[in-house]
Each structure stands twice: as structure tokens, then as C-alpha cells.
A protein has these predicted regions:
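Short coil/turn linking the two alpha-helices of tandem helical-hairpin repeats
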Residues: 104-105, 111, 179-188
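Conserved catalytic breakage-reunion loop centered on the nucleophilic residue
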Residues: 170, 176-178, 192
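Short, conserved phosphate-binding/catalytic loop or strand-edge motifs used
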Residues: 113-121
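Acidic, serine/threonine/proline-rich low-complexity intrinsically disordered regions
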Residues: 116, 127-130, 184-192
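Acidic helix-start/capping segments at beta-turn-to-alpha-helix junctions
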Residues: 18-25, 88
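Membrane-proximal, proline-rich intrinsically disordered regions
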Residues: 1-18
Length: 192
């Protein structure tokens, strides 16, 4: 379930291309891209909203929660090898970091959810404060670095196509660092 929350930006209904110019689609007249072009985007009704989920996709916060559940419980499985457990946990760590990064690119500094809160958590525990830009980037990069250790160098098996490996993790890490080095965040004291 950790992979299920990866954004689906390839379909007609979720494509950013529909808001770029006069593109038309034969299937749908009112895609989210068209609604954004018409000015129907708002804080209370976001299109392409990763915070609360959109289309047939759940919220990235749900994805982070599922990743944390897997990481916390993978070592309770009795019929897996230690290597398999470590590899699956590393994939979940990477996906958790990637979901934090996607939220960061949309909303700036975000609350960091490294562990799930218990259902008995108090109101004060639930109200997690927003992190700074540096804290967000440091957390994402450190989580990716932690995941890389137990990821395979490269997945070449046809049964494992699309699974996270070191090449994918390092490429996303470079994107995170490049994004953080942009003038929007690097040295911009007015913004954050």
C-alpha cells in the first residue's frame, strides 16, 4: 500500500498539461487543469491537492502513515528473510521521504511525521507544528540516506520493475537538494 499513494499525473483527468494552453481532450470537458484555467482553484477546493487527496488517490499523509506502519511492523513478519525485511523497510522509508518532498514542493515547510501518533494522543501532541525549510530538507535527505543503505543498487528483474532502488533514491535526493538550493528557499529570509 505504500506505493499506492504515488501521484498519478499521466491520466487525462489529472494531467497538468490540460492547463498549459488551448489543449483539448476528447474524453473530458472539465478536467482539473481546465478548472484551474477557469480560475476555480481555491484554498478550500484545491485541484491537484496532495494534502487531502484528489481523484482516485488518497492523501499523501495517508501514504506517510502506511509507510510508518510498515516500517514499525515489518520485523514482526515471521516468513521473511532479514534482507527482505530491510529492503522493504528501506523502500517504505524512501517513499515516506518522497511524500514529504512532494508536500514540501506544494506547500513549503510542512509538519514532519517521522512516527505515527497513537490514537490516544492528546490535542497538543496532534497539533504538530510546521518545520522550517532547513528542517524539512534535512529530514527528507537524511531519510533517503537511511533508505539507500538497504536498497538494492539496481532492480533489473522483470518481477521488480518500478520498485525503488539506489539509482532512483539518489536521483530524487539530487532533486531535493537542487530544489532546496533554488533562490526561493536558499537565503530567502523574506519567504521563510
Amino acid at each position: 500500500t505504500c506505493y499506492a499513494y504515488l501521484p498519478k499525473n499521466d491520466g487525462v483527468y489529472t494531467s497538468f498539461m490540460t492547463m498549459s494552453d488551448e489543449i483539448t481532450t476528447p474524453i473530458a470537458k472539465e478536467t482539473d487543469g481546465v478548472r484551474i484555467m477557469k480560475g476555480q482553484q481555491s484554498a478550500s477546493n484545491p485541484k491537484f491537492g496532495l494534502w487531502s487527496g484528489w481523484s482516485d488517490q488518497g492523501s499523501l499523509w495517508e501514504g506517510i502513515r502506511h509507510c510508518n506502519i510498515l516500517i514499525e511492523n515489518i520485523h514482526n513478519v515471521v516468513d521473511m528473510t532479514e534482507q527482505e525485511m530491510n529492503s522493504w523497510a528501506a523502500e517504505a522509508k524512501f517513499l515516506k521521504a518522497y511524500y514529504h518532498f512532494l508536500l514540501f514542493t506544494y506547500y513549503g515547510p510542512i509538519p514532519i511525521v517521522d512516527e505515527n501518533l497513537p490514537i490516544s494522543a492528546s490535542d497538543n501532541e496532534v497539533r504538530v507544528k510546521r518545520s522550517t525549510v532547513d528542517q524539512s530538507v534535512d529530514y527528507i535527505v537524511q531519510t533517503i540516506d537511511d533508505a539507500i543503505i538497504d536498497l538494492p543498487v539496481r532492480e533489473l528483474s522483470s518481477n521488480d520493475l518500478g520498485r525503488i532502488d539506489q539509482v532512483i533514491a539518489k536521483s530524487i535526493k539530487s532533486r531535493v537538494l537542487l530544489y532546496a538550493a533554488s533562490p526561493l528557499f536558499n537565503g530567502n529570509s523574506e519567504m521563510y
